[in-house]
Amino acid sequence: MAKRKISKAVLAYSGGLDTSIILKWLQDEYECEVVTFTADLGQGEEVEPARQKALDMGIKPENIFILDLREEFVRDFVFPMFRANAIYEGEYLLGTSIARPLISKKQIEIAHQTGADAVSHGATGKGNDQVRFELGYLALDPDIAVIAPWREWDLNSRTKLLAYAQEHGINIDNKGKPKPYSMDANLLHISYEGEHLENPYAEPEEDMWLWSVSPENAPDEPEYITISYKNGDPIAINREEMSPATILETLNTYGKKHGIGRIDIVENRMVGMKARGCYETPGGTIMLKAHRAIESITLDREEAHMKDELMPKYAKLIYNGMWWSPERKMLQAAIDATQENVEGTVKLKLYKGNVIVVGRKSEVSLYSEEHSTFEADDVYNQKDAEGFIRLNALRFIIEGKKQPERIKSLIGDYEETEVCRIETGSITICERIKRFFGFGKKTDKNA
């Protein structure tokens, strides 16, 4: 199929080997003008060098965009996701997945601003990111052209990439010393894939982990912190109010120090294969624990249970790149409605990889000490439980009377076996069972 004629393309550009080669390839293959977009999501690397690299490759200064998106990333993407307590397949806190919608959004905005008719990314044809990026592009601009070089070119090995870079005079720092892993980082996490991790039985080397100390080498003394919440979002640490990005940066500092947030998982990619990934999400791990703790005293029981039922669906939508979908927006509206009274303070103990909740309080707490006390109280009539239990057991009682053979299959024949002769008061256990289901005469009203 003939290539669509492209006049200008916005490239998600990091300044690294892959995207620098893509930049040159777009110029040669599509003969189009290229606009570079570099996002600062708190990945911990200098982003300004990408400007000079783009200039060196002939990009006009007005076509180079480097944006600090840290606050927007945490406020508008990370925090809403954490209101849902989203976890994919029980462990993954979606650090890569949640960054892609924002990058897609900014690329489309820049395309409209510069009059570009295409966008391009550096995701491979085997991973999830190609789907996440492109679903975002097409949700926000159905007419935009999408260029995915990894699905078009034949540069399918690092050797070929380096040869292409050398042939075209692309200056890549340390191009002869590739990183040992495929990595992605932002304020929420850092990920590692590839190399010896492709053997799912091989233990990661300790020097792979770049953010956190190992739990074994973490401080021998625990550290206590408090996190304050308002409308489901953290607003202060140790009573000091901070911006969203600063909140996450601060929690990352605590988590890294105490070896918190490391996971090693094999996940089911949306493209059909299983892939192993190692992740460090120190601040996010602390934040998730604290959020669930404050919800435990401020959410109604059924509200909390329904949220837990919705969470896997929500997490799957994020993982699969469906951030801009109607169903994600619908779920987000429902989740956000539950957060109106999720406010208060959580006290945490951080110790050798563990986040331990040791206290929680709220002015709108649904926890009532006078109702839940084990001591004498004047507000809870324990006799009220009898009717509640009888009503909940009504279907069991009817079933026991109408279908006695089924009950017998569950507890055996009603003979005074060795077990049944165990006495509780003046009657045996079997007699109690028979009376409960209406098979025996009840002579003791307290039985």
Curated annotation (Swiss-Prot):
Keyword Amino-acid biosynthesis: yes
EC number(s) from the headed UniProt entry: 6.3.4.5
Transmembrane segments: none
Pathway in which the depicted protein is active: Amino-acid biosynthesis; L-arginine biosynthesis; L-arginine from L-ornithine and carbamoyl phosphate: step 2/3
Molecular functions per Gene Ontology: argininosuccinate synthase activity; ATP binding
Gene Ontology, cellular component aspect: cytoplasm
Predominant subcellular localization, coarse grouping: cytoplasm
Binding site for L-citrulline: Y92, S97, N128, R132, S182, S191, E267, Y279
Binding-site residues, L-aspartate: T124, N128, D129
Annotated PROSITE patterns: ARGININOSUCCIN_SYN_1, ARGININOSUCCIN_SYN_2
Keywords assigned: Amino-acid biosynthesis, Arginine biosynthesis, ATP-binding, Cytoplasm, Ligase, Nucleotide-binding
One Gene Ontology term from the biological process aspect of the record: urea cycle
Binding-site residues, ATP: A12, Y13, S14, G15, G16, L17, D18, T19, S20, A39, G122
Catalyses which reaction(s): L-citrulline + L-aspartate + ATP = 2-(N(omega)-L-arginino)succinate + AMP + diphosphate + H(+)
Cellular localization per UniProt: Cytoplasm
Subunit structure: Homotetramer.
Family: Belongs to the argininosuccinate synthase family. Type 1 subfamily.
Annotated protein name in UniProt: Argininosuccinate synthase
Species of origin: Sulfurovum sp. (strain NBC37-1)
